């Protein structure tokens, strides 16, 4: 394994003058972690480290954001991102996130953060539907079309000098023999990881319930859970806006229901038509969309990916190649972006490549342990949904909202109050004030339309403490 001080010791250019620290010392690892400080190689002043030749296999958000974060810290890095699909092609529909991720994005690269926020939809409240009954949860969040996110990050990476290559497939790691570092960002079925499977100690565990990731031309204003009874059992979806025209809609059910409805034998088009009939009320008659990336959506089972270590020699895992979390937690892309920030941080702070990879491995694996545990709990809750669905809907919605752990008694009282329209409006106004405060604190000037104004990246802003964590 190469030292950062050997071989490709390309000195950074004037354009790559070291950034000041992007955050303070690391706290106890959490899933929100992702700050950076200047690299300090032995005998060198802070911020005068060496550049490397880095290749990212896979061109998803994690790979692109790592390239951005690494280039922001050292413009001398020679970074290539290799993606097998053409530009604009992506699976799935939307990506959800919260203010905590925006804090990290603004701290690490305000330019792309502003573009992401401006292109995102805001959803206020969560709506839980069971037949014609409705209950509410007083949470808010943001979502963005995955294709739009990829476009923003690709353009920003290219601006910073990253070589983003599409329509290229890596069949043999020998093609990358001249790379100082190979970052495996090629998803849960990572071929790069499989080459060194014995070293990474990969464990795969499949969930019980089948699910299918669809779109819909109904634009939801709230994050919506819809549960519908059928002769074969309960079936449900999770939906949220992806853009001004489209929402994401993930449908799930027990395997007995899936087979009982014939969804295991119907082709995609017929299966989608059946789901449209089942969810006609919740969809207000709108269509479900079963084509993504030019391919028909298919039913699948979630697979949890865990690895005993995320690095081997000069290969390191990032995002779904390293770990997966159940979609009911909604954290996959967010966690990949935090991995990207942490890896860039470790490369920037450690003098030797082995030490950098070990630091990244230690911190992010520690941060992911509780997240994956919570995701397993969430998955199991939905796999045993029949235990809860006969409850009063308001109590069912509360049980769903606290499925990852007990809450203080007042939390239930707040939930009951949220069912009253006037009090729900008060809570929404309080959330609006919180959003504005957080936006101002991170330098984003929220306007009535939800757009943002540009803020210059100053040394003081980059050195600010870690952002709000939800």
Where are the language model's segments positioned?
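C-terminal helical "tail/cap" subdomain of flavin- and related membrane-associated enzymes
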Residues: 345-470
């Amino acid at each position: 394994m190469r030292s950062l001080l050997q071989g490709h010791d390309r000195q950074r250019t004037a354009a790559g003058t070291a950034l000041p620290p992007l955050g303070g010392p690391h706290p106890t690892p959490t899933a929100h972690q992702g700050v950076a400080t200047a690299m300090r190689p032995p005998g060198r002043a802070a911020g005068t480290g060496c550049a490397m030749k880095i290749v990212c296999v896979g061109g998803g958000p994690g790979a692109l954001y790592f390239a951005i974060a690494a280039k922001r810290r050292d413009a001398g890095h020679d970074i290539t991102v290799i993606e097998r699909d053409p530009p604009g092609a992506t699976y799935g529909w939307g990506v959800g996130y919260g203010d905590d991720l925006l804090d990290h994005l603004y701290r690490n690269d305000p330019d792309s953060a502003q573009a992401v926020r401006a292109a995102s939809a805001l959803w206020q409240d969560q709506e839980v539907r069971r037949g014609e009954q409705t209950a509410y949860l007083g949470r808010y969040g943001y979502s963005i079309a995955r294709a739009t996110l990829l476009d923003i990050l690709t353009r920003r990476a290219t601006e910073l000098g990253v070589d983003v290559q599409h329509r290229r497939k890596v069949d043999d790691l020998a093609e990358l023999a001249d790379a100082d570092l190979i970052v495996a960002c090629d998803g849960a079925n990572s071929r790069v990881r499989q080459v060194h499977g014995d070293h990474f100690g990969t464990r795969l565990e499949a969930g019980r319930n089948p699910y299918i990731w669809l779109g819909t031309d109904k634009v939801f204003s709230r994050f919506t859970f819809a549960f519908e009874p059928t002769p074969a059992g309960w079936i449900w979806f999770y939906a949220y806006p992806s853009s001004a025209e489209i929402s994401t809609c993930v449908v799930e059910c027990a395997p007995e229901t899936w087979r009982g409805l014939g969804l295991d034998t119907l082709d995609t088009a017929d299966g989608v038509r059946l789901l449209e009939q089942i969810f006609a009320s919740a969809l207000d008659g709108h269509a479900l969309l079963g084509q993504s990336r030019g391919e028909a959506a298919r039913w699948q089972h979630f697979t949890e990916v865990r690895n005993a270590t995320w690095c081997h020699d000069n290969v390191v895992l990032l995002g779904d190649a390293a770990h997966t979390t159940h979609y009911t937690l909604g954290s996959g892309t967010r966690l990949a972006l935090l991995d990207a920030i942490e890896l860039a941080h470790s490369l920037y702070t450690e003098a030797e490549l082995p030490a950098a990879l070990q630091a990244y491995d230690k911190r992010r694996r520690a941060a992911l342990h509780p997240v994956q545990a919570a995701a397993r709990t969430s998955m199991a809750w939905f796999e045993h949904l029949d235990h809860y669905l006969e409850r009063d809907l308001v109590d069912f919605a509360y049980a769903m909202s606290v499925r990852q752990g007990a809450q203080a008694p007042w939390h239930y009282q707040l939930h009951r109050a949220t069912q009253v329209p006037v009090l729900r409006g008060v809570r929404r106004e309080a959330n609006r004030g919180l959003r504005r405060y957080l936006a101002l604190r991170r330098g984003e000037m929220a306007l009535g339309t939800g757009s943002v104004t540009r803020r210059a990246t100053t040394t003081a802003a980059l050195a600010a403490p870690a952002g709000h964590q939800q």
